[in-house]
Each structure stands twice: as C-alpha cells, then as structure tokens.
C-alpha cells in the first residue's frame, strides 16, 4: 500500500486540476467566415486560448451573413445567444434597435480593461459608433471595400497593359470588349451588385445613397439612388450585358470564383476575397482601385466599407464578458490586426496595424495589397459618403438585387428598376422607423 500522504497529495492535485478545468469559461463566437478566412479565424482563436487558459473562444461558422444574423437574433429570444456575433455592416441599424446587444465600450469598462477607441481607423469606426456619444457599439473586425481584380495574363493576350487596370467605368467597358474579342469567356463580372454598383458607386462618385446623410441623421431617411447618375451607370452595365461584355453570375461573391478559375478576366469584389484569390488563382493577377464615372465631378471621392463587426450579446455573466473583452483586445493588438489584414485582404482596422504592415515591407512585396486602404483614405468622407445606417437594409439589398436582375433580363429599364427599388425600399424604411418609435 502506498503511503497515505502520497495518496492525499495525488488526490489534492487531481481535485485542483479538475477545478482548473471546470474554471475555463467557454465563449461561443458565431461567424460567417468560410474557406481560408475561416481557417484564419480558427487560428486566432487557438492562439488566444493558448495565451489565456482561463477562457476558451469557440468559433462556429453559421452560414452567410444573412443566415448568421437571423440565427443570432432568433436564439437571443430563447436565451441561448452566442457571446459574440459577427454581423455585416448593413445589419448595424438592426442590431442597434434589437435590444439584444451590449455596447463594446461598456464591456471593456466593466471588465476594467483600457479601451482606446481612437486606435481604429475613423472611416471604419464611424460606421459602428453611436451617433450621439461617439462610442463604439461593436468592434470592427473584417472590414473591407470593393476593389478591381484583373487577370494580367489575359490583359497581355488582349493587347492591354497588364500594369494599367481601367480607371473609369468607361475604360472598363472598353477593356472588357477587347478581352472578349481575344477569346476569354467573360470580360467582366461583379460580386455583391447592390453594394458595389449602387452603394459604393454612389460614395466613390460623391453621391448620396439616401437622405439624412444616408440615415446617420435620422430614421426618417428616404432612398435616393434612382438619380440620373446612378441610372446612367446601370444603363451602361445593361448595354455591356447585351453585348456579352458584362456577365451576371449571382447576388453574392460568385464572381470571385469565376475570376480565380480563369473564366472572367475582371471582377469587382470585396478586398476580403484576396485570400481565396491568392490561394486558388493560377495566373498573374493585379488589384486596382474601383473604376469611377469619368463624367462625375471631383471623382473619385472615398470608398465605404463592407465586411462585418463583432457584436457582444446581452444576457451573459461577468466572467464571460471579461473573456470577451480580453479577446476583442487581443484582436485589436497591432501584430494580430496586421496579420489578419495581411492574410485575408481585409482592411487594417487600426492605425497601428497599418503602420506595422507598412514597416514590415508588406506593401512593397505585395503590390496592390494597400489598394483598399488607399481607397478608404482617398479623400476625407463627406457627410453622405461615410457609410449607411438604414433600417431593414439587408431586406433592401434583396429588393435591389431583384430589381437589378429585372434589368439584366430585359424586363425593366434601369430607370423603372431603380424607381421601383426606391419605392419598395422606402416602405421598409418607414416600417423600421415606426418600430423604433413604438
């Protein structure tokens, strides 16, 4: 028989280990990052968990942005919401009005962790800040903007300069026709058509998308993207479509795959698509700025962000919120934010991450990697080009998709389609306005 004191010591050690295991606070994190992006999310969580053994971030892919938002709100009503929910930028007004969230500045304050809100790039943080207090409601994470990807090898074959992507939409139409004539299957395709062809087109060309400074100044905003400039742009795409120089391939990021598999020579897509393009493209490619309308006065202006931020959900205990604050602080550290930016193509969300990336020589070694950032900082944003804050915006995007599809199929003129989209969208805005006052 073993001596009693050894047995007692072993028992005490075992109980201590069990206690430590039980003390680990699990923090569910629902997101919409798949493929290479999902792998990087997992990597960040694993590193945080290794450095903070009292907490365990559990990332779970819950489908695309719409699916994740719907799932998060639905389970909140049952009391089973995740601690952290990734929500795309147009879900901001919905989250603000949901009463399901705990503002991140409160989370940090209650956890006793210093939180410097000024560290975030203003054009990014402004999208997620309270209009009255200026405090962040959610933490920027995978912020992006739309950029132009182009196949340099296809450019050479078509007799185009592979180092000179089209600067204007008029140039793009001309380039696409030449690419098609050279034998490529698809000259140009676009991802996220509402976000790129109307939301970002408007901001990049110095045009409002909606009144009340795109909704930042009140829920009584009305949509304004059926003006002559936007109608002219959609009409140009319609004409390209008729000629076969513009291919409509889907409502989301389907054009990215069409690009990296070599079908399409050019696409406008999220800067966050760079990770998959870098992984799968078997040809030389370039990253250019979004084209602007050659007839637009003072264009280009500034791009607005897409992507998503991290929202903290209500109803959790103090220890969970402390772990959440530690994780969000971890994500914002320069070395982690810079790595996320460099590996994914999403914007550097903090000034320090941008400076570190530049100091490391990343932009020199990877031409075009700073394109999205330069677009965001091209000019100081106007009151109506800093972003959108419109209720029911996810549903409005669906309406825009439906109406643009009616143009590509020849069922409506650009003016008819945009007028109808504005009319239908305004009905949703009034419904949202009413709900916030009830």
Swiss-Prot record:
Keywords associated with the record: Periplasm, Signal, Transport
Ligand binding (sn-glycerol 3-phosphate): 65, 89, 144, 270, 307, 346, 397
Keyword Transmembrane helix set for record: no
Location(s), subcellular: Periplasm
Gene Ontology biological process terms, A to Z: transmembrane transport
Pfam families: SBP_bac_8
Keyword match Signal: yes
Signal peptide (UniProt feature, chain positions): 1-23
Gene Ontology CC annotations of this record: outer membrane-bounded periplasmic space
Family: Belongs to the bacterial solute-binding protein 1 family.
Stated role: Part of the ABC transporter complex UgpBAEC involved in sn-glycerol-3-phosphate (G3P) import. Binds G3P.
NCBIfam families: PRK10974.1 (NF008211)
PANTHER family for the chain: ARABINOSE-BINDING PROTEIN-RELATED (PTHR43649), SN-GLYCEROL-3-PHOSPHATE-BINDING PERIPLASMIC PROTEIN UGPB (PTHR43649:SF31)
Subunit field text: The complex is composed of two ATP-binding proteins (UgpC), two transmembrane proteins (UgpA and UgpE) and a solute-binding protein (UgpB).
Protein name, UniProt field: sn-glycerol-3-phosphate-binding periplasmic protein UgpB
Native organism: Shigella flexneri
């Amino acid at each position: 028989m073993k001596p009693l004191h050894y047995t007692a010591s072993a028992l005490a050690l075992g109980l201590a280990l069990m206690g430590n295991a039980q003390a680990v606070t699990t923090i569910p994190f629902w997101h919409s990052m798949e493929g290479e992006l999902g792998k990087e999310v997992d990597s960040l969580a694993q590193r945080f968990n290794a450095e903070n053994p009292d907490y365990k971030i559990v990332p779970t892919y819950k489908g695309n942005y719409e699916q994740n938002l719907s799932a998060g709100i639905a389970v909140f009503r049952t009391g089973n919401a995740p601690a952290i929910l990734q929500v795309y930028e147009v879900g901001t007004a919905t989250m603000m009005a949901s009463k399901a969230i705990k503002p991140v500045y409160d989370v940090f304050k209650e956890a006793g962790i210093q939180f410097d809100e000024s560290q975030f790039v203003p054009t990014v943080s402004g999208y997620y800040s309270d209009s009255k207090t200026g405090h962040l409601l959610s933490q920027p994470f995978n912020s992006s903007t739309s950029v132009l990807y182009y196949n340099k090898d296809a450019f050479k074959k078509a007799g185009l300069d592979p180092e000179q992507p089209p600067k204007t939409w008029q140039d793009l139409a001309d380039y696409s026709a030449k690419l098609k004539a050279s034998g490529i299957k698809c000259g140009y395709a676009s991802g996220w058509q509402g976000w790129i062809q109307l939301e970002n087109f408007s901001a990049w060309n110095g045009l409002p998308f909606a009144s009340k400074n795109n909704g930042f100044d009140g829920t009584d905003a009305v949509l304004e993207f059926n003006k002559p400039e936007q109608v002219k742009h959609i009409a140009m795409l319609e004409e390209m479509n008729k000629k076969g120089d513009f291919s409509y391939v889907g409502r989301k990021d389907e054009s990215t795959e069409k690009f990296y598999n070599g079908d399409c020579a050019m696409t406008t897509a999220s800067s966050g698509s760079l990770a998959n393009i870098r992984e799968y493209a078997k040809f030389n490619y370039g990253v250019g700025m979004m084209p602007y309308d050659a007839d637009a006065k003072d264009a280009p202006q500034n791009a607005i962000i897409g992507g998503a931020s991290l929202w903290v959900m209500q109803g959790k205990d103090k220890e969970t919120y402390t772990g959440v604050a530690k994780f969000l602080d971890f994500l914002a550290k320069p070395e982690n934010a810079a790595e996320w930016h460099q590996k994914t193509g999403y914007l550097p969300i903090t000034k320090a991450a941008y400076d570190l990336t530049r100091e490391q020589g990343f932009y020199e070694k990877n031409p075009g990697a700073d394109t999205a950032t330069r677009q965001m900082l091209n000019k100081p944003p106007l009151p109506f080009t800093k972003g959108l804050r419109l209720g029911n915006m996810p549903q409005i995007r669906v309406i825009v998709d439906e109406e643009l599809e009616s143009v590509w199929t020849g069922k409506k003129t650009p003016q008819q389609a945009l007028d109808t989209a504005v009319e239908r969208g305004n009905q949703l805005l009034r419904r949202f306005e009413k709900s916030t006052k009830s």
